[in-house]
């Protein structure tokens, strides 16, 4: 055997190790559609729900507990009846949850506490901003001018446009 030939031989180091076999489930869904959004079926139920705009991780856990769904299961492992129950609950705007957990409290027209999801939330936020502009509130005027709305300082941050820099005097 030549000296250099031992270096050219590749040894399979993983050959002795046993790899755990993945259990294939025929009912597993890799993509679950809820509220017009595709959710990754390989994520745990509360975490997958938090991918929806308007539902955070905490609300995802609360929804799973309210519907008696297992929080340690992946969303793709749920049965079709469970998924349908979940879809109906998420897409309903009124939840039987504490007020502090909802994202649209005391709606101006009806006075109800709602939790909006996905495009409903985006549309409602835009309508609220337009209402503030229409009634000429302080926040509405700040929105119109493109300035900071929530009381942040504007002296040094939030500048838009070209940066000019310091101009030196000509000598």
From Swiss-Prot:
Annotated Polar residues bias: 1-11
Q: Where are the transmembrane segments?
A: none
Q: Residue ranges under compositional bias (Basic residues)?
A: 144-158
Q: Which GO terms describe its molecular function?
A: rRNA binding; structural constituent of ribosome
Keywords (alphabetical) are:
Ribonucleoprotein, Ribosomal protein, RNA-binding, rRNA-binding
Which Pfam family is one of this chain's hits? Ribosomal_S13
Q: Which domain of life is it from?
A: Archaea
SS bond list: none
Q: Carries keyword rRNA-binding?
A: yes
What is one GO cellular-component annotation here? small ribosomal subunit
In residue numbers, the region (Disordered) covers: 1-24, 144-164
InterPro entries recorded = Rbsml_uS13_C, Ribosomal_uS13, Ribosomal_uS13-like_H2TH, Ribosomal_uS13_archaeal, Ribosomal_uS13_CS
Gene Ontology process terms (BP): translation
* Coiled coil, from the record: none
Instruction: Give the family per the record.
Output: Belongs to the universal ribosomal protein uS13 family.
Function, as annotated, reads: Located at the top of the head of the 30S subunit, it contacts several helices of the 16S rRNA. In the 70S ribosome it contacts the 23S rRNA (bridge B1a) and protein L5 of the 50S subunit (bridge B1b), connecting the 2 subunits; these bridges are implicated in subunit movement.
Which NCBIfam families does this entry report, sorted A to Z? Answer: PRK04053.1, uS13_arch
Its subunit composition reads:
Part of the 30S ribosomal subunit. Forms a loose heterodimer with protein S19. Forms two bridges to the 50S subunit in the 70S ribosome.
PANTHER family registered for this protein in UniProt: 30S RIBOSOMAL PROTEIN S13/40S RIBOSOMAL PROTEIN S18 (PTHR10871), SMALL RIBOSOMAL SUBUNIT PROTEIN US13 (PTHR10871:SF3)
What is the protein named? Small ribosomal subunit protein uS13
Native species of this protein? Thermoplasma acidophilum (strain ATCC 25905 / DSM 1728 / JCM 9062 / NBRC 15155 / AMRC-C165)
């Amino acid at each position: 055997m030549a000296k250099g030939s031992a270096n050219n031989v590749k040894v399979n180091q993983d050959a002795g190790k046993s790899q755990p076999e993945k259990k294939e489930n025929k009912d597993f869904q890799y993509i679950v559609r809820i509220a017009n959004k595709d959710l990754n079926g390989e994520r745990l139920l509360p975490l997958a729900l938090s991918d929806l705009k308007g539902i955070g991780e905490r609300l995802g856990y609360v929804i799973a507990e309210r519907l008696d769904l297992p929080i340690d299961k992946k969303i793709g492992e749920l049965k079709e009846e469970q998924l349908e129950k979940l879809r109906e609950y998420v897409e309903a705007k009124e939840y039987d949850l504490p007020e502090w957990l909802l994202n649209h409290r005391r709606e101006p027209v009806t006075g109800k506490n709602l939790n909006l999801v996905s495009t409903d939330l985006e549309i409602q936020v835009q309508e609220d901003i337009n209402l503030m502009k229409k009634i000429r509130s302080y926040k509405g005027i700040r929105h119109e001018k493109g300035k900071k709305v929530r009381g942040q300082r504007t002296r040094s941050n939030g500048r838009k446009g070209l940066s000019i820099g310091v101009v030196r005097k000509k000598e």
